[in-house]
Amino acid sequence: MSSDQEMAIFGEAAPYLRKSEKERIEAQNKPFDAKTSVFVAEPKESFVKGTVQSREGGKVTVKTEAGATLTVKEDQVFPMNPPKFDKIEDMAMMTHLHEPAVLYNLKERYAAWMIYTYSGLFCVTVNPYKWLPVYNAEVVTAYRGKKRQEAPPHIFSISDNAYQFMLTDRENQSILITGESGAGKTVNTKRVIQYFATIAVTGEKKKEEPTSGKMQGTLEDQIISANPLLEAFGNAKTVRNDNSSRFGKFIRIHFGTTGKLASADIETYLLEKSRVTFQLKAERSYHIFYQIMSNKKPELIEMLLITTNPYDYAFVSQGEITVPSIDDQEELMATDSAIEILGFTSDERVSIYKLTGAVMHYGNLKFKQKQREEQAEPDGTEVADKAAYLQGLNSADLLKALCYPRVKVGNEFVTKGQTVQQVYNAVGALAKAVYDKMFLWMVTRINQQLDTKQPRQYFIGVLDIAGFEIFDFNSLEQLCINFTNEKLQQFFNHHMFVLEQEEYKKEGIEWEFIDFGMDLAACIELIEKPMGIFSILEEECMFPKATDTSFKNKLYEQHLGKSNNFQKPKPAKGKVEAHFSLIHYAGTVDYNITGWLDKNKDPLNETVVGLYQKSSVKTLAFLFTGAAGADAEAGGGKKGGKKKGSSFQTVSALFRENLNKLMTNLRSTHPHFVRCIIPNETKTPGAMEHELVLHQLRCNGVLEGIRICRKGFPSRILYADFKQRYKVLNASAIPEGQFIDSKKASEKLLGSIDIDHTQYKFGHTKVFFKAGLLGLLEEMRDEKLAQLITRTQARCRGFLARVEYQKMVERRESIFCIQYNIRAFMNVKHWPWMKLYFKIKPLLKSAETEKEMANMKEEFEKTKESLAKAEAKRKELEEKMVALMQEKNDLQLQVQAEADSLADAEERCDQLIKTKIQLEAKIKEVTERAEDEEEINAELTAKKRKLEDECSELKKDIDDLELTLAKVEKEKHATENKVKNLTEEMAGLDETIAKLTKEKKALQEAHQQTLDDLQAEEDKVNTLTKAKTKLEQQVDDLEGSLEQEKKLRMDLERAKRKLEGDLKLAQESTMDIENDKQQLDEKLKKKEFEMSNLQSKIEDEQALAMQLQKKIKELQARIEELEEEIEAERASRAKAEKQRSDLSRELEEISERLEEAGGATSAQIEMNKKREAEFQKMRRDLEEATLQHEATAATLRKKHADSVAELGEQIDNLQRVKQKLEKEKSEMKMEIDDLASNMETVSKAKGNLEKMCRTLEDQLSELKTKEEEQQRLINDLTAQRARLQTESGEYSRQLDEKDTLVSQLSRGKQAFTQQIEELKRQLEEEIKAKSALAHAVQSSRHDCDLLREQYEEEQEAKAELQRAMSKANSEVAQWRTKYETDAIQRTEELEEAKKKLAQRLQDAEEHVEAVNAKCASLEKTKQRLQNEVEDLMIDVERSNAACAALDKKQRNFDKILAEWKQKYEETHAELEASQKESRSLSTELFKVKNAYEESLDQLETLKRENKNLQQEISDLTEQIAEGGKRIHELEKIKKQVEQEKSEIQAALEEAEASLEHEEGKILRIQLELNQVKSEVDRKIAEKDEEIDQLKRNHVRVVESMQSMLDAEIRSRNDAIRLKKKMEGDLNEMEIQLNHANRMAAEALRNYRNTQGILKDTQIHLDDALRSQEDLKEQLAMVERRANLLQAEIEELRATLEQTERSRKVAEQELLDASERVQLLHTQNTSLINTKKKLETDISQIQGEMEDIIQEARNAEEKAKKAITDAAMMAEELKKEQDTSAHLERMKKNLEQTVKDLQHRLDEAEQLALKGGKKQIQKLEARVRELEGEVESEQKRNVETVKGLRKHERRVKELTYQTEEDRKNILRLQDLVDKLQAKVKSYKRQAEEAEEQSNVNLSKFRKLQHELEEAEERADIAESQVNKLRVKSREVHTKIISEE
């Protein structure tokens, strides 16, 4: 196992490949009982872990880890491996090899995301269903050149081993990858190809061929690009896999003599043709069909004559049509790119798409049966025409060939009739044949392209084929797949055990050869041998009358009862009938033979095949070339005319031929096996289903391999290693002191151990063990080591104790000796003789001094002579030393020169390394940039789709709003007509009725014109939407640009603002039209109401205005009060903040004092901890209370601002209405007089037309002045119209120029797309070049290491010389110090003992001082806590003041409710006035009824018009009750109050719940709170009373509002009843109106003519104004676009210049942009959610649209104010949240500080003062009392916070309702402008990117050249260094010899 340092080369992939050292050590040390730890069989989980409880009578009782107890048989219990085998990398090395051990090892590794595991020769991989970082370039580099045992299991390891074996053994290799669908075979195949394309890269492009469009990339690119193309045509969605390969493939990658890629080819097997015409519900057909219909390339849709809806084509829509994990548009581009890279010509590319489209059309061919015949005939020719056109055929010939095919009978051809079903079968067979042959042809073309004609020597084959399949319904396809796996398993068994047994033979082990490959022979022979299943199937296909039944009977006759592998299936309920069963190695499979004969023959319509051969599509003709006579393959089949008269090759024969070729290829290679496992059916990462995995392990041969392995000796070890490791088991078996061979030692050792001696064998170099024995030896070794270590520890401890005891004895003897001598001296010190001795002894020495002097003189003379000799010798040595120093200096100069040269070489090498690192960074940057661009491109594509969806939804919203507006206008117009008609009927003005009818028609025309204008606006939006879609499609290919993504958010904001501006312009134009219409309406409103009604309304409105002004004043006063309260709250918050800082400072002082004291008692620690927590909690409560108060104040302030704004708007509306009514009053007076005279004239001369004309002339004279004004206006408008037409032409010309510019940009975009493709290819080349450069740098680094080693050797030689020079000096110093230290050693020991005693005394004194300091510190703490209690009392008083302020706010809220109640009463009075007016109108209607009783005979003629008037009267009644609006507003307010009431109720309930929780806390700590409990209970009771009082107040308010609402409902019901009564009266009145209308018709003819002229003039004026506005809008739009384009051009130019100056800044921006992309994605998701919410709100608001339309502008202003207030509130809220978060962090820090101080307080537990403890307890009790008060205040503050949050949500909803719809429409319009600007930006960026790429390429080539030069210089330096090294060694040798 590798160390963590060795695993570091794998980077971030290391944890996913191998366990860390820590985990391995933990596993080895884990407790484990080998006798009781087992796996046990269990029905649900297959196997579970457990512990053996007992064994008796062949039964075992096991307790599982889940706690269940199972009693099972002995053979259902499997021993568990020791913990050191947990997550083992090679399962063949496990002690106990069985199914549960394999299963749990895979499961535990999978849980740790180690998905690769070895199992002997296998590599097992489990699909992780998530991305793991184990395939990057770092991992590829780490595995390169590593042996299998040196690196963790990985597909790269398998690949590298195959590659290395190929190079070293000169043998072809193969990698067999098998597994079920969805297990990851295709992905692992891609990784193998990726590995070879990386390590064996050529880096050279193939030579260009003359055919255009070929050779778009290197060989590596083409090998990699072959995969997307094959996946498009051969992969499909299945139930278990979204990208399942429906064919097998064998990819051969050929290498040259140097190991570089030379070429490649692909062989395919068993393409699932049936999927072309049939799919299950949860599956779909091949990807290519849906890619084409994704509309990513619209030219394909046009070329193939198809639609984009898959459901239009039967062959591809039988299952699902979309796959969430696959982007068909992007996949189409990848497929198309792969076709180009692989060198297909343009004609071949078109042919591929055409044939694919023809297959789709084939599924839509319809046929019917002729009458009275079974003959089929075409049912329409349209589809046949399309299919024939795509295939280059004549449609008539095609249909004729299908319905009347020609068959050969003898030597003649006859025409045969076909039934409808036969024709459909033929069509399906043709479609499958065309698709199959086209797929095989593409594979052939790919192989031709990958064949580079370069010299190639060996290949590595990768086999990706489906694994063993056992389904409920198994057909011929499953038999072929299972037979293939049977052959592969036989091949594996043979290969695996042949290798094993060859090793046994080589090692000389006695072994009886077993051919495990023959284990499967019976099943294989049953299928493929003569008279086998395939043989009988082909024989049956020869007979024309053969059926499935005859085939089954032959099978039974031939094999049932004769072959053990062939059985009759057992009938199973609920499953499809099976006809026979085969026993495969992986299990028994039931096969159903229905349709096998047809599948095997695969017949084709010969006549249609003949047409295909003559097709004008060359590819189709080539596909069927060589198909002669009856079948497309008659001439080419190998068995034609030879096997039982067969003239065709069957599917089974072709399959066996391909399989034999495959097995031949595999037998010629050295195989490597990879088994892919699917862990679960739900694609859940990390989950493993036991039964599913075991089934696959059986099917793919893993357990079969284990079975074979167990029969042999899977564990083996070298003799020397075995002796070294297991010698401890019996050391006496190997004699000491004499040589013994390792083999003999191993034999003796094993013979002396109590084990089964049949479980191992001795080879020549290794000892071989059966499975499990090595684990037993390991356990025995562990036990022996434990015993030895225990014994060693005991002996070591004994020896150390004895040494210490000896030292103690020696010290005691020395002390006794010293004491004895000192006592003896003290005894004789005063003895007289001793004193005399002390005096005489110095005198005795003087006599001897003269002798000593004489001797010294002699010695001096001798010394003098010796000194002279020494001086002479010294001078001689000095001369020698000078010479040596000279030589030394010379050598040092040489060494210095060498060092300098070496330093230069190292410096150059470092520069090269730095250059290489920079290049790698640049290459990595470009690679990451490309990957980011691809990801961004995908994200932007998704965003584009979302924007398109939003656009369509917004368009629908616009339509709905326009319809609503039209409806409102129509209803308004109808209401006005009703009022007009009622007035005329009451006055009896028949002439006026006809006149108003004419005006009504004119207004309808105007209304229609308005609708036309709205339609024109809608068309504009549609045009812009189409332009946006087109531009987005053009920009998709360039969306990878990083700079555009950086600005995307800003562009979207600009787009939104621009669209808002455009929509506002459109709304203003609409409003202008409405104003024009309203001007006409004002003429009609002159006759709408009587004078008395107008007077009463004016008076009512004036009274209401006075009331509203009064309310405004009151609200303003209220706002001032609230502002004062807010200021007070802020002041209290500032005080609380100050107190918090004081408490923090005090806490720091506490910490310092506690550090000085060194600790306190455990009780004090606990109290201090609680006290600090309480302080923090009180601080937090105060801050939360402040936050809540301010939030409440902000909410109230916003509410009052909204109320003031609303009331102000109502006053403005009322004043406008008042002015309007006064104007109407004066005009109506004049017109009433005129109408009165007209009425008299009409009543006197009903039949006299001349009198009526004169009356009209009188009326016209009164209108003469108005007509003259209109005429003058018409003249002005005519001139203006001409001028506008001129401007319109100019604007149209400018618009055309802009369109031309857009088309030019589109063409430029296509060119840039091609340039980007080229840049991508260049990027890939740079990546490959980077790999080569990395190899070169690696070799340079190696050379540098050699130079560094040489330099170190020179340094060592130099140091050796220095050591030799200093050695003599050191020896002299050692001798000198030795005698000095011996003399003073004993004195130092005494001094040391004295110092120790002094030190102990000093320590004791310091301890006493520390205790005194602790006492003083505790006294200080006591004083400080008293001060804190006083501060907290002040805080409580402030909190009480805040509560009082809240109570004041509550009283103000009650006052507001009372004001609203008064407003409701006033509204009720207005309603009663309206009812009074209704009653007066009813009386007048009765009068009209009596006056027109004679008109009953004309009822029928006016019935339809009267019905319309009936509806209009009902609307009029609703409009008369204008108080209804205010009632509706009061209802809204009531609902709000109810909601607030419910919120307050919820808050109160929460407060009660919190109170109960706090009471529970009080009960738990009641022992500590006895002193303050009564006070807390009293305060809680007071707060409860306040809450109850607040509840009662709100209940009373709600009850009063409910009663008012009931009264309002009753009044509305009365109004409805009155309305119904009026409708009945109106029906009677309508009968009377008919007669008067007919009489007045003639009189109004001239008036109509005049009115018509006026209306035409008005229409022309409106048209001119609209044209002018449209042109102005277009001009403004074009100018804005131009300005935006110019501004972005300048901005991008500056940005790119800055990028050139600083590349590092660009890299940082890359990271920032990636983060912003994620942010934009998050914001986009948020906007989508908001949009959905708004759609729901819009549907709720539509019912109130009438009121909203009339007050739209006022509502917009109100919304702006609301947004401003909401923003302010959000800022304040965020500010307070930040403050709260900061305080929370401080709290946590302080709590941590207290915890740290707690440990220091433990030491002083016994020294704490009892008095101090009592005082602290009292203070803590007081603190808790204050805490209770603060918490009670907190409860009320929580209620306020909840109210604030709900109001914030309401503000946001109102803001979105008024703003978001308009913003969404404007955003889309501006997006179009942004995309147009981006086209130019992309163009410039592409050009600059190309230039930058060229610069980088030139730099790279320059650096590569420099690198080569550096390598040459390094070689020269190396040779020089070698020379210097030799020379230096010679000098060194010379110096040593001279010394």
UniProtKB/Swiss-Prot annotation:
The modification Phosphotyrosine is found at residues 389, 424, 1464, 1492. Residues 86-782 form the Myosin motor domain. ATP binds at residues 179-186. Its main location: cytoplasm. Residues 785-814 form the IQ domain. GO terms for molecular function: actin filament binding; ATP binding; calmodulin binding; microfilament motor activity. This is Myosin-1. The gene is MYH1.
